[in-house]
């Protein structure tokens, strides 16, 4: 039998299991996606998906006419709350009058439930639907009503070519190659990787439905993020209760981002 040298554990839900397995195979390197537990042979990895989420918010804010944007969300955890907030901050920058209405599904993947949530938001009058789900059901539901859609994870344009605007996307291959090279060069050490657009592990895709001027604006904001000239969470940021979380020019630390449990004030719905 050939010895396995590297294992990627690709879901948050695998965390406790991979911790136990790593103890039993000290000669194998384990990398766990989106977790927070580490060991000598166990590291974690994720991406700053909030960066492209902010950019898609700019698009949604510009494209809405009703000033009501729907968001189909998975779980009330910092990863998801952070992404919704980044999206909402982008929306507010483009359109201070727009609100984001959030419906929670409490699942990563349940197409029928996701479609139901999207339909409820469409019935409220949403003319843009965004999501943090693993299926394209919300995108498809929007498309069936002729409403703009913003996907998640991958380019979902094939599921609603006439209404798909944009999506934050993952480029995991770049990270996998990096880890494999570190291991082959005997340079791998356990760490907690959190890469952004500048690393190539996350990015944004846009369809031709995005007007040229808006596309140029998004590209410029993307460039500023890469050059560390702009942070999506740069203050002033005010939460739903009217508290100033970050004053002008202030930005949260990574620790604060990783523990985020509050919504900015243009979101309708509770993060609790």
Protein language model regions, located:
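A residue-level marker of the well-folded mature domains of exported/periplasmic proteins
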Residues: 1-272
């Amino acid at each position: 039998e050939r010895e396995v040298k590297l294992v990627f554990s690709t879901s948050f839900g695998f965390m406790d299991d991979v911790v136990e397995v790593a103890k039993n195979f000290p000669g194998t390197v384990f990398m766990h996606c989106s977790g927070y537990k580490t060991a000598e042979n166990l590291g974690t990895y994720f991406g700053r998906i909030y960066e492209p989420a902010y950019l898609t918010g700019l698009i949604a804010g510009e494209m809405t006419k009703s000033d009501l944007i729907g968001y189909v969300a998975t779980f009330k955890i910092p990863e998801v709350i952070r992404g919704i907030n980044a999206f909402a901050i982008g929306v507010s920058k483009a359109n201070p009058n727009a609100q984001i209405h959030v419906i929670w599904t409490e699942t990563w993947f349940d197409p029928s439930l996701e479609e139901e949530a999207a339909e409820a938001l469409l019935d409220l009058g949403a003319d843009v639907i965004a999501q943090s789900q693993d299926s394209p059901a919300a995108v498809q539901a929007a498309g069936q009503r002729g409403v703009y859609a913003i996907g998640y994870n991958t380019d979902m344009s094939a599921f609603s070519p006439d209404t798909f605007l944009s999506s934050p996307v993952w480029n995991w291959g770049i990270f996998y190659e990096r880890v494999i090279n570190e291991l082959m060069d005997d340079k791998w050490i356990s760490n907690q990787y959190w890469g952004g657009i500048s690393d190539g592990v996350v990015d944004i895709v846009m369809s031709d439905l995005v007007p040229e001027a808006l596309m140029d604006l998004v590209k410029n904001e993307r460039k500023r993020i890469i050059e560390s000239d702009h942070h999506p969470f740069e203050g002033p940021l005010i939460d739903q209760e009217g508290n100033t979380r970050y004053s002008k020019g202030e930005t949260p630390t990574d620790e604060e981002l990783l523990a985020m449990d509050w919504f900015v004030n243009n979101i309708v719905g509770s993060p609790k």
